[in-house]
Amino acid sequence: MASSPVSRVVYNGKRSGGPRSPGAGSEIFTPAHEENVRFIYEAWQCVERDLRSQMGSERGLVEEYVEKMPNPSLKAFKPVDLSDLKRRNTQDAKKS
């Protein structure tokens, strides 16, 4: 069975201001964690905005990156559904 190439979305642009992360409720996050989450959120918002704005155009700011030589150690990698993981952790915390 041939392994399919790994693809990633690559954003080539500047960061901009955007909405901040909602209150954490009972969870406590470090300022570094909040900064990382904010950076990822803002970067992804820029990617989505650029994808919407380039619809129909031949080439835009957002390109799909395809790995030419995928790492063999990642062959069995299964992505994690972070929403599901958070939901399960929240349910486990309520049981305790």
UniProtKB/Swiss-Prot annotation:
Q: Which InterPro entries match?
A: MCRIP
Motif (PXDLS motif) positions are: 79-83
Instruction: Describe the task this protein carries out.
Output: May play a role in the regulation of the epithelial-mesenchymal transition.
Q: Where in the cell is it found?
A: Nucleus; Cytoplasm, Stress granule
Q: Basic and acidic residues compositional bias: what residue ranges?
A: 81-96
Extract one GO cellular component term from the record. nucleus
Q: What is its main location?
A: nucleus
- Source organism of the structure: Gallus gallus (Chicken)
Region annotation Disordered: where it falls in the sequence: 1-28, 76-96
Q: What family does this belong to?
A: Belongs to the MCRIP family.
UniProt keywords (A-Z) are:
Cytoplasm, Nucleus
Query: What's this protein's name?
Result: Mapk-regulated corepressor-interacting protein 1
**GN (gene name):** MCRIP1
Please list the GO biological process terms of this entry. Answer: regulation of epithelial to mesenchymal transition
